[in-house]
Amino acid sequence: MHISILLMEQIIELFIMIFMGFIIVKTGIVKDEDSKVLSKIVLYLNIPCVIINAFQVDYTSKTVRGLLIAFAASVILQLVLLFIISAMGRLFHMNEVEVASVYYSNSGNLIVPIVTFILGQEWVLYGCAFMSVQLVFLWTHCKKIISRESSYDWRKIVLNINMISIVIGVVLFFTRIHLPQIINDTIGSVGSMIGPASMIVTGMLFAGMDLKKVFANRRVYFVTFLRMLLVPLISLILIKISHMAYLSADAPKIMLIVFLAVITPSASTVTQMCQVYGNDSRYASAINVVTTLCAVVTMPVMVLLYEEFI
């Protein structure tokens, strides 16, 4: 119950940030299309800093074991969910924005502040394991469907700053190299901007929408149901039957972090990619806002279910 209450408080904070983005557009300080610049900063600066900073922890056998559990769980969950959601996409005639919004969680923007707030900074590393796996899918599968490209450009994928940051972070961790304090502090400070920046982008886009059309669109609620209820319940079942939460003394908390990453609202990164690659960013933002609104209730409930059944 304690974790659920802390989680609800954190989500409310994020909503206030969305409201700030909404206000600066409605008062004429900036235009909603100005959010595209901020989206690029999040994608190409904040996220890489978060990843590198998370891997700047002491190398111990306990940490390595926990990291391997987190990586294995993240890969298994995301592969199974990709198969299930792709099948649902064909069954329910979902477009690429809807499929991406159901599949991709907002772990990249929310898991760091949420885990730091409810468990502590030392546990963020395991959330970044999920983020790293999801980033691979984001810059392959998601980029392909959002940009409507017919094939993968592997050179661009491999040389993407987010992929490079994963490699740098992992290499630094396993070679036990710690960056100079001033550099590490700078990277940490820039990375800490990810939550506020992403929520402000969402608020700015939301301010430019016709709110009546947003809330009158039944598809938004259908996508929200899939993202916030069905996907978390499927994930909970997968975690239960896999027994991965019983692999070590820390495994229950590690799997809780992976579960938290899965049950977050639809990814702000989908909205940002829609902006960058010319897809329907307003629809993606509408889904993001409605799922974030629902998260105030659904995420604490799902955590309670996790604590009860895992």
Stretches found by the model and what they are:
Residues 1-310:
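Alpha-helical transmembrane segments of multi-pass small-molecule/ion transporters
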